[in-house]
Amino acid sequence: MASQQYSLLVVDDNEMNRDLLSRRLERQGYRVTVAVDGRQALEFLNREEFNLVLLDIMLPVMNGYQVLEQLKADQSLSNIPVIITTALDEADGKARCMELGADDYLTKPFNPVTLKSRISACLERRQRAQAGQ
């Protein structure tokens, strides 16, 4: 899957995590935008077009659950795949994310190969769903 055509939004309040993730994804050919909190993420989502969101849960201003809930409630944004990337490894948190509409859930630190395959799988599912419409 050619990644150059895809634009990803990385939402994480930790600068080191944002930088590491965005550099890794850019090396794979993705266009990457970073947001430092939930409110900024929603502002970007309402201004620009993204193919996938990598969303942390523990964010200032507006947490990842709130962002996910608003994103999935907005018909113009609800079809964007969301992969949760968080240090939280609780069954309740994972279940809540899936109930709110997350497409996948990765616990930090995660393997770069796993991340790459999960992103590809989400993008392929979205592409197939759009082709079927």
Walk through the language-model features, giving the residues of each.
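Short hydrophobic/Thr-rich beta-strand motif most characteristic of the beta2 strand and flanking loop
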Residues: G29-V36, F44
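Charged docking surfaces used in two-component/phosphorelay signaling
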Residues: D19-R27
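The feature encodes the CheY-like receiver
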Residues: N14, R18, P60, E69, ...
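C-terminal output helix
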Residues: F110-I119
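Active-site beta3 strand of CheY-like receiver
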Residues: E48-L54, L59
